[in-house]
Amino acid sequence: MAKRYGRQTPTYEIVGKYAYTDGEQATALASEFWDAPLEWQQHFLDVMLARDKRDKYAFKTVGLSLARQNGKSWSVRARCFYGLIADGEKILYTCQHGDTADGMFKELSAPFEDEENEDLNDLLDAVRKTNGQQAIYLKNGGYIRFTTRTNNLARGKSYDVVIYDEAQELTREQQDASRFVTSASKKHNAQVIYLGTPPN
């Protein structure tokens, strides 16, 4: 194995108590289709999928600030993949730039569209590829929508999980436009995830 450089633990972290995590199962699933995670990627996935004694997410809000090109997308991709398949979650993935949304969409949709992955392909209901309206729909009721942010983002819609990628560019107006989309979640187990890059 090649030698790893760089720190594998957060410089600064606040994580509360939790009963258990689905992180290990999510990693096993994701690693069938993408590379195995680095230590810190696994840790972040464990935090996102941590549960309390009621089997609800222990952390309703999760945030990560990390320099560019360090692998944030692996953990988030694995988080979405597991949420869609295992829990049938309705997920809204938002970012500031279209190419970021395109990249995440292509990475997540590829395993479902590959007919050699029979179990995943059978679970797939539809893939929507129209720019600005990209989405993956599963037969278990789960779906994920990929979009760039606007000041009227997601009004009138309901999601279980909202992800703000490129959150360092998130405006108050954009956040307000999607603030209440998880309040009507039928699972009553909502989560909001912020991913950002620290300023130079």
Outline where the language-model segments fall:
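Phosphate/NTP-binding elements of NTP-utilizing enzymes
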Residues: 1-200
